[in-house]
Every structure is written in C-alpha cells, then in structure tokens.
C-alpha cells in the first residue's frame, strides 16, 4: 500500500524541474560562490513587490512567523520557505505513521524527495490562492479575476525558485541548505535592524527610534533625567529595548554551549588492527529540524484560522480555533491571536504576560516541548539517521563498535540515538521557550534557528579547512 502510493506519484515526479547532481567534486571556493549567488537571488526576490496588488498595508496576520519562514510581506517572497517546510512536515508525518514507507534504497529515497517536492509545489499554489481570496492584497472582486490569477502565478513561480535554490545547495553545489541559509539571513537581518534601526516611531512619550542601541543614545541626549532615560532604554514597551538585546546575546551563548554536548562511541576498523576512532552522538542529534517543523505546523494553523476568521467571523468553532485582533503599536500593523487554540500555541509576549496568564504559559511550554520531542524522534526514521541506518553506514565503512559484534551494533546504538533525538528535541523546545520568556529579539524559535544554522556553517568551514590545510588555500 505504502510503496504503491510512491509508485502512483512517480510519473508526476518525473516531469518536475530538477537540479542534476554535480559530475565532479565542487571546490570550496565554488561552493561559496554558488551560496552567495543563491542568497543574492533570494534577497532580490525579497525586495521585488508583487505586481497587481491593491494594498498590503492591512494588519499582517503572519507577522510573528515571517522571521522564521523567511518571508517578506507584499513581495515575491510572500510565502518564503513555508511550502517546502510544510510539504516536509506532511511527508514526515505520513512516513512516521507508516501510511507510506520509505525503503533504504537510493531509488526509494529519491522517490520520497520527489514526492516532497511535488507536494511543495501543490502547497505553493494552495497557499497563493488562500492569500489572494482572503483579501490580503485587496478585495478580489475589485481586483478582478485576471489580476488575482497574475498574483497567484507570481507566488507560484517564486515558490518554484525557492525550491530549486534549496535543491541547488542540497545537491552539493553550495554550502548547507537553502532553507537554513534563508532562515539565518532573515533572522540576523531582523536582529541587526531591531538593534540599529533609524526608523522613528511616534509614541505617547514622544518620538523614539526603533533600534534599541540608537534609542539608548537618543534618550540619553534628549532627556534631562538620565536615570529615567536609561530605564526607558532598558525596559521600554512595544519597541525593542536593551534587555531584549541582552537576552538575545545570552540565548546565543547558551545554545552554542549546548552544541558541544555529545557522547563519543568508540569504534574500530574491522579490517585493520589498531585503527580506532569515535562516532559522536550530539545532544542536538536532529539539529534544528524539530523547531522548523513545529514552526510549519503553527504557521499553517495560523493560515487556516485567519482564513476561517475572515469568512466566518463570530462562528463558535472558528473562535475555538482562534480569535484575532489588530495592533500597530511599536511597528507595522499586525494581527495577533487573543483567544482560542492559536492564542495558547503562541508565545507570551513577555515575562509579565506569563505572570498575567500562567495557563497560557503552561500550555505553550507543554506544546513546545512535546512537539519538538515528537518531531525529533520521528525525523530520524525518515532522514536516514536512525540506529539501523547508522549501523549500516558503519558496516559499509568496515567499522564496528568496540566490544560489540556487527549483529549487536543496532541494539547498542538504539540505546543512544532515539534518546538523544527525543531529549535533544526537548532541549531545543525548552531553549526556545526560555528565549521567548526573556523577550529575545526575533522570537525564541528564530534565535535558536539562527544559532544552530550559523554553527552548522562554522562546522562546514572547519571541515573544509582541515581537508585543504590552510585558510588561504581554502578561499584563494
């Protein structure tokens, strides 16, 4: 039944655009160049406005998710990486529930990846239609069918570009993956902007700068009471403050510290005597995958809730899913959940909000920890990183665990890998919650993603440098 499903969609996968694997080893400097080109294309798409939209100034329903999903309001990157991540989430859940089975052969894995890409394109079209028909760019009846279709086509083509850019890096032409690169860029851009933004905001206390550091100097220069000015710079509401910035740096340091936690399993060569090595099992065994999938789940729930709330406002079941309110305080107009399931699955705005509504905080903590642990545990089964897959890789390299035969390696690895995956996912969720409660810039999830992705690129750079021998030879 499961394999039949993949076989059914095989003809459709064959007609999808695909990046061919490189026929030769790509040098590091070429990888850096392709990564830079990929990032440049993404950033250009983030600045090109959608043609035909009447307005994008209304309250943004996905403001809270845009940093994580690398999307930009009213541009070609409106959908960001959401379709790719959502298709991965769906395929993972189907594989985890054994509705479809992914074999160990490269053919089955390639078919699974093709199915994921196909679903990504279908989801892109679906999300584009929902965005247009719910009036995000103006009343569809006023815009007309032709303009609506044009906007949908633009979003689809942009989504296809993101899919291909991600595949370009994944196939080995660049460094890391497109998803990781786009997320990290978007989050780092947000942090720098919130710290140094020269944009002025008219508050009840007078005109203030949005950037926390610029606001500090501005307040000290314009206020006669310097102590009060410092207090405002550190604790002002609805705008980035210095405590948010300090919390962000603190979370960066904590996550980097946890990146070093691992268990080294001793292994030896089955062919050569005296050749010993270690196989590291990191605390963050599945890296940032759990938090990416959790973000995709929540963002799609937001989309559904917003769509239903627009069409069926006041309906009891719709309100049970989520009720929304618009605000423009401290930045662009945005919609945020004030009730229903969406409210309880969204992070509290500050530590003060935790004290005001502890039930909200408890439900959010349980959801974050549980979902991250679940996604981490199920991801290892479909990504080729389970105990059985690792044992197979070691066997192919003619390596065995010291003190164990080949037949008992899977059993021994099963003692560590599923535990590391589940506990690592739990820690990822816990760190994200901590960052949210501390008020870190870019949300706890965003900070966590940025740090893990930057650390991955650091590891890639170190690995390439060790192979080449020097930094000069690496780049020039």
Curated annotation (Swiss-Prot):
The keyword Transport applies. Keywords: Developmental protein, Endoplasmic reticulum, Membrane, Protein transport, Translocation, Transmembrane, Transmembrane helix, Transport. Coiled coil: none annotated. GO terms for biological process: cotranslational protein targeting to membrane; habenula development; post-translational protein targeting to membrane, translocation; pronephric nephron development; protein insertion into ER membrane; SRP-dependent cotranslational protein targeting to membrane, translocation. Residues 2-33, 97-117, 166-172, 262-288, 376-420, 463-476 are cytoplasmic. Belongs to the SecY/SEC61-alpha family. This is Protein transport protein Sec61 subunit alpha-like 1. It comes from Danio rerio.
């Amino acid at each position: 039944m499961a394999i039949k499903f993949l076989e059914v969609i095989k003809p459709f996968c064959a007609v999808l655009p695909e990046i061919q694997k490189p026929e030769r080893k790509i040098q590091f400097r070429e990888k850096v160049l392709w990564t830079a080109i990929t990032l440049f294309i993404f950033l250009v798409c983030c600045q090109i406005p959608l043609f035909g939209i009447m307005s994008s100034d209304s309250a943004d329903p996905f403001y809270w998710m845009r940093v994580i999903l690398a999307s930009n309001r009213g541009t070609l990157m409106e959908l960001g990486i959401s379709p790719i991540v959502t298709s991965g989430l769906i395929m993972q859940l189907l594989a985890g529930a054994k509705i479809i089975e992914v074999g160990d052969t490269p053919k089955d894995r390639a078919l699974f990846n093709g199915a994921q890409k196909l679903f990504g394109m279908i989801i892109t079209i679906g999300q584009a239609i929902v965005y247009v028909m719910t009036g995000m760019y103006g009343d569809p009846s006023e815009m007309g069918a032709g303009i609506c279709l044009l906007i949908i086509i633009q979003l689809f083509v942009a989504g296809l570009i993101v899919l291909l850019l991600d595949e370009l890096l994944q196939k080995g032409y660049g460094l890391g993956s497109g998803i990781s690169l786009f997320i990290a860029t978007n989050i780092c851009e947000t942090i720098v902007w919130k710290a140094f933004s020269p944009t002025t905001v008219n508050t009840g206390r007078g005109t203030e700068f949005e950037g926390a550091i610029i606001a500090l100097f501005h307040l000290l220069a314009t206020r006669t009471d310097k102590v009060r000015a410092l207090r405002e710079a550190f604790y002002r509401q609805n705008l980035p403050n210095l405590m948010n910035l300090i919390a962000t740096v603190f979370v960066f340091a904590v996550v980097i510290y946890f990146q070093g936690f691992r268990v080294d399993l001793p292994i030896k060569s089955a062919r050569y005597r005296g050749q010993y090595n270690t196989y590291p099992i990191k605390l963050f065994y599945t890296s940032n995958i759990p938090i990416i999938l959790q973000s995709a789940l929540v963002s799609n729930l937001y989309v559904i809730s917003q769509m239903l709330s627009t069409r069926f406002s006041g309906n009891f079941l719709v309100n049970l899913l989520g009720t929304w309110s618009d605000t423009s305080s401290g930045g662009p107009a945005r919609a945020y959940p004030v009730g229903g399931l969406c409210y309880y699955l969204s992070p509290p705005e500050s530590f003060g909000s935790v004290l005001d509504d502890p039930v909200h905080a408890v439900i959010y903590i349980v959801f974050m920890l549980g979902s991250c642990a679940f996604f981490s545990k199920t991801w290892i089964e479909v990504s080729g990183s389970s105990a059985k897959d690792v044992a197979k890789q070691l066997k192919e390299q003619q390596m065995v665990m010291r003190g164990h035969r080949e037949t008992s390696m899977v059993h021994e690895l099963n003692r560590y890998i599923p535990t590391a995956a589940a506990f690592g996912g739990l820690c990822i969720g816990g760190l994200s919650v901590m960052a949210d409660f501390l008020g870190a810039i870019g949300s706890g999830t965003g900070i966590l993603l940025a740090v893990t992705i930057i650390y991955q690129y650091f590891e890639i750079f170190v690995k390439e440098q060790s192979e080449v021998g020097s930094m000069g030879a690496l780049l020039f």
